[in-house]
C-alpha cells in the first residue's frame, strides 16, 4: 500500500478512502458533457460503449438484465448460482436475442409435433423456426401464425408449415440486400442457404429494428449482444468455463471473495489456458493482489473486498480496503501491464462512478443500483403501498444454502464448499429489498448522464483522461453533510437522488 501517514506506526499507517471521503476537483474545461467518449475496456479484448457492468448476482443478472444492459451499451455478467446447463442456456438466450445473422439457428424436424415447436419458440422467445431434415436441408418454416388456430397440438409440423420454395438468401449477403428482400416480399425471416439448399443462417426483420432502436448496443464481431458469465475456482469451474465458452460467452469472471489466494490463482491460470475467451480475475483490494492476478494471466482485474451494500465481510471477517483506495492501488499494478480494472461495489450515486474512474477503474460493476430495475430477477414486493424488489449478497445465507439436489453453486465463492450442513455456514452477506426503480434504460440514463456531467467538470473527454486529469480533495464529515441537500424538507424526489 502506498499512502502512509507520518508519525503513525507502519502497521497502521495506510489511509483508506472511499467515495464519501473524497470529491473531484473541478478543472479548466473545454469539454461538453454530451460530447465525451464513455466507451472503455472491461478486459484486454472486450470493449463496451458505456463503462457499466451488471453484477453477477442472482437477484441482479440473468438473461433479461444482460440483454437490456448490452442494448444500452454496457454488459451483464450472468451469475453462477445455476447449474452449468442453466447458465449456458442463459448465454444462449442473450446471444440469440438479436444478431446481424444467426449462424446456428434453432430448427425443428418435420415430424416434430406442434406442441414441441411451440415450446421451442417459447423457450427462445422467437416467433418461428426453420424446418430441416437430418442433413440440415431447408424444408420449410413454421411460425406462430401457422400454429395459432391449430387446436390439435399433436399434429406434425410438416402438416402446417410453409414448405419450400421459400424466399432465401445466399451466405454472405449484405445487410442492405437482405433488408431489400425482406421488404420486397413482406417477410420477417430470411433463411440463408448454400448451393445444396442446406440452412447456414437466418436473418430477421427484428434484428434490423433492434439495430435502429438501440444504436449504442454493445455487440460482438458477429453482431450479437455482448455477455459475460461468472465461474468459480474449482474442477467444476473448469467444466463450466469450457461449456460457457462453447456457448459463445464473450468473457468469464473467476468469481471469488479473495482472488489473492493460491488456489484461486491456480484455477484462474487453468481456466485461462483452457478457453479461448478473456478471463477476468477477482476480487482483490491491494496492489499486490492485482499483481498476483496479472501474473496468473488474467485479462482484467476486479476490485472490491466488502464494499457492497449487502456485504458483511468487513464486519464478519474484519477484512477489506475502502474502495477508492483499493481501486487506486490495484490500478498501479494493472496500468503497467495494460490490464483493465473493474471497480466492483460501494457505488451509491452517479457521482461515485466518476470517482471510481478517476481513481483508476476502467469500468464499474453495479449491484444495488440495478437490483430494483424491472429487468432484474428479484421478486417484486409490495410493502405499505410501495414497490420493492428482493436483493441479497451472494455470501448471504439464502444464496449459500443448498439448492435442488443438495448442491450450492455460491458458497464456494467464500471458500465454504466443503460445509455439509447449512446451519454451519458462516455468511458474509445479508438479504433485503431495494426500492423498485422501473426500466433499466431510465436508470442508466441518469447514471450515464451523471458521469457525462462529471467528465465535463473535470475536463476529461474520455475515460482515460478521467484518470490522468481527475484530482481529488479529501473532505470531512461536515464536508459530506454539505455535499448533500440540507436545511430543507425534500417534497419531491429527483430521479437520480435519494438520501440513503
What are these model-derived regions, one by one?
Residues 64-67, 239-244, 285-303, 343, ...:
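Catalytic cores of alpha/beta
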Residues 47-54, 100-105, 164, 220-230, ...:
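Short beta-strand/loop segments at the ligand-binding rim of alpha/beta enzyme cores
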Residues 1-28, 108-109, 169-170, 230, ...:
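Alpha/beta catalytic cores of nucleotide-metabolism and tRNA/nucleoside-modifying enzymes
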Residues 78-81, 107-108, 128-130, 168-170, ...:
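Catalytic beta/alpha-barrel core
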Residues 34, 84-92, 150-154, 174, ...:
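Active-site-adjacent beta->alpha loops and helix N-cap segments on the catalytic face
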Residues 71-86, 195, 247-261, 299-317, ...:
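Glycine-rich phosphate-binding active-site loops on the catalytic face of alpha/beta enzymes
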Residues 80-95, 131, 135-151, 182, ...:
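Terminal amphipathic helices with adjacent charged low-complexity linkers/tails
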Residues 34-48, 55-57, 86-126, 131-133, ...:
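Bateman/CBS regulatory modules and CBS-like beta-alpha motifs in cytosolic regions of diverse proteins
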